From Swiss-Prot:
Main function: This protein specifically catalyzes the removal of signal peptides from prolipoproteins.
Broad class of the protein's primary localization: membrane
Gene Ontology molecular function: any one: aspartic-type endopeptidase activity
Membrane topology note: Multi-pass membrane protein
Swiss-Prot/TrEMBL keywords: Aspartyl protease, Cell inner membrane, Cell membrane, Hydrolase, Membrane, Protease, Transmembrane, Transmembrane helix
Organism: Borrelia hermsii (strain HS1 / DAH)
GO terms (BP aspect): proteolysis
Record-stated family: Belongs to the peptidase A8 family.
Entry protein name: Lipoprotein signal peptidase
Encoding gene (name): lspA
Pfam families in the record: Peptidase_A8 (PF01252)
Catalytic reaction annotation: Release of signal peptides from bacterial membrane prolipoproteins. Hydrolyzes -Xaa-Yaa-Zaa-|-(S,diacylglyceryl)Cys-, in which Xaa is hydrophobic (preferably Leu), and Yaa (Ala or Ser) and Zaa (Gly or Ala) have small, neutral side chains
Chain segments annotated as transmembrane: 9-29, 72-92, 93-113, 142-162
Record localization: Cell inner membrane
Record flagged with keyword Transmembrane: yes
Length: 170
C-alpha cells in the first residue's frame, strides 16, 4: 500500500486533536459535575450539560448484558473495525471521505478509551430537548465522540450518494 506521508501525518494530527477534545471535555465533566446532576442549561431547557454514564452502546443498548459479551461486542469488535477504518483513511484520496472516516475513527477511539479506563461507563454530558419527536422528549445524552461518529457517518453517506461518482478527488 502506497501511503502519502503528508496525508498520514495530517490524519494522525486531526485524529489526535479530536480525541483530545473529547477526552478533555469528559475529564472536565467527571472532575466538576457529580454523576446524575445538571450543570448548565441553555435556551431554557433546550440544551443541558449533565453528567451521566453509559455502560451500553447507542441509547444504552446492551447495558445489562454479561460483562464478557460486553467486552467482546463493545471493545474487541470495535477495535478491529477501527483498525480497518484507519486503513481506509490511509488509502482514501477523496478529502471529504477521508474527513468522514477520521471523524468516525476519532469518535470510536474516544469511546473505547472510556470503556477501557472509566469503569462506571462512557461519560455522556450533552443533553438536547427533542420535542416529542419519535416519542422522545429529550434526545439520549451523548458526548463529542458520539457526535463525531454521527457527523462522520452522515458526511460519508452524503459523499457516497452525491459526490463519489462526480469526482475522484475533491
Amino acid at each position: 500500500m502506497n501511503i502519502d506521508r503528508n496525508r498520514l501525518i495530517g490524519s494522525v494530527i486531526f485524529i489526535f486533536i479530536l480525541v483530545f477534545i473529547d477526552q478533555w471535555s469528559k475529564y472536565l465533566v467527571v472532575k466538576y459535575i457529580s454523576i446524575g446532576t445538571e450543570y448548565l442549561s441553555f435556551f431554557g431547557d433546550f440544551f443541558k450539560i449533565i453528567h451521566v454514564r453509559n455502560t451500553g452502546i447507542l441509547f444504552s443498548i446492551g447495558a445489562n448484558i454479561n460483562s464478557s459479551l460486553k467486552n467482546l461486542f463493545f471493545l474487541v469488535i470495535p477495535i478491529i473495525i477501527l483498525v480497518f477504518v484507519f486503513c481506509f483513511i490511509l488509502k482514501e484520496t477523496n478529502k471529504i471521505a477521508r474527513i468522514a472516516l477520521i471523524l468516525i475513527l476519532s469518535g470510536g477511539i474516544g469511546n473505547i478509551i472510556d470503556r477501557l479506563f472509566r469503569p462506571l461507563g462512557v461519560v455522556d454530558f450533552l443533553d438536547v430537548k427533542f420535542f416529542g419527536i419519535f416519542g422522545l422528549q429529550r434526545w439520549p445524552t451523548f458526548n463529542f465522540a458520539d457526535s463525531y461518529v454521527v457527523i462522520g457517518i452522515t458526511l460519508f453517506i452524503i459523499y457516497d450518494l452525491f459526490a463519489k461518482n462526480k469526482s475522484t478527488d475533491l
